[in-house]
Each structure stands twice: as C-alpha cells, then as structure tokens.
Amino acid sequence: MGSMIEFARNGQRLGGYAAKPEGAGPFPAVIVIQEWWGLNEHIKNVAERYAREGYVALAPDLYRGKVTADPNEAGKLMGALNREEAVKDLLGAIQHLRAMKEVRGDRIGVTGFCMGGSYALLLPCRTKEIRAAAPYYGEIPDEAALRNLACPILYVYGDADFWITKDEVKRLEASLKKLGQAGEVKIYPGAPHAFFNDTRKDVYRQTEAQDAWRRTLDFFAKHLKA
C-alpha cells in the first residue's frame, strides 16, 4: 500500500513514505511526523493505517535516511535537526500533497509523535494550509506562537510522561482558552511517553492507544472528510 517517494521542497529533494487508499479519490490527506528514532517501520505502519481509513498519508524523512533504535543516537539526531529546516520540509510536504490529483488540497491534517508531536503542533502555527492537527505528547510552543494557531487541535497526552510535564499541558489548555482557539486536550491517566508505539512493549498501552486512535480518526473525519 505504501512506498518511499521523493518530492521537492525549495529546490531540494526530500524522501518520504507515502501510502494511499484504493481508488481514484480525491481523498483528504494526513502528514505523519516521525518520533526521534527517524522514519522507521512504526511510522510507516501508522501511515498505512491512515491510508486504510481513507487518507493519503505522507511521512517526510526529516533525518534524510538515518534511523536508530538507540536512545543516545536518537537524541543526537534530534539535536542536530534544525527546526526551521524541518519546518521547511513539512511545508514542502504540504505543497507536494496539494499538487497530487488524489488529494483534496484544502483537507490536509497533521499528526506526529514525541518529536513529531512537537512539529505537529508547531506547523499549524506557521501555515494556514493545515486543516486539523493531532499532536501526540509533543513540546508545546509559547503563547505567542499559539496565537497564530490556524486550525483545531487534538492534543494527546499520558500523565505519566517523563518528557512533557503536566504543568506544560495545563499551560496549553489555559492558552487555548485564553486565545479562543479550538482545541481539545485528551489526558490518559498513568500512560507514559510514547504509549501509542506498539513496537515498544516497555511503554505501549493498548487500551489507551486504541482509544486515542479512535478519537483521532473521529477528529480528522470531522475536520477533513466533511
């Protein structure tokens, strides 16, 4: 169902994993942003799951082919990733999707996990071309950035997360309310960071992950399929 592709962004070539539903479309689309491990089989599988639900899914390869299962190496890769260049990669992914005949160009969403969750929340603060965003346990921008949030969000979080604090999530909720931004924060008691990743038995929580998936599908259906 899916395969590696290349697409252009600002004159550069960037790789990514694309998965499409069966049929001619046009379909809504979802950008799937990797964890700090890189574009691994788990992220490719998530893209394929979205395709089975009727979305064209594109997971950009932000690390340019580098993938690891070692936390120390993952930290180095994430630390070496230039945030503004990564945003340009994601903006390029949007333009690639908008140019595809199989895609409804005004129905593009974004999701991401861990590091990817950070970018999935930042991206709709940088462009109005994202219709809905579902960041999972990502870093939260400051209020000045959130002021530019251009779409509804569903922020998914487990309150046993060692990376993102409960206070940060409360700050997000308060900022959304203060700014009048459309958003929901779903908190899973006792769920750790990366609880959605079913390839990591140390942190995967099946019940919470399945519920988060259902909620995310409902959220995207409301904003991307309507």
Residue map of PLM features:
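Hydrophobic residues in well-ordered beta-strands that form the structural core
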Residues: L58-A59, P135, V185
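Short beta-to-alpha linker loops that shape the active-site pocket of alpha/beta-hydrolase fold enzymes
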Residues: L62-G65, E139, A191
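C-terminal catalytic histidine-bearing segment of alpha/beta-hydrolase fold enzymes
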Residues: K177-A226
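Acidic catalytic loop of the alpha/beta-hydrolase fold
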Residues: A160-I164
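Short alpha-helix in the alpha/beta-hydrolase fold that links the catalytic acid
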Residues: T165-S175
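Short beta-strand/loop motif that positions the catalytic acidic residue
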Residues: L149, Y155-Y157
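Serine-hydrolase catalytic machinery in alpha/beta-hydrolase-like enzymes
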Residues: M4-V103, N197-R200
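Primarily recognizes the serine-hydrolase "nucleophile elbow" in alpha/beta-hydrolase
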Residues: L91-A150
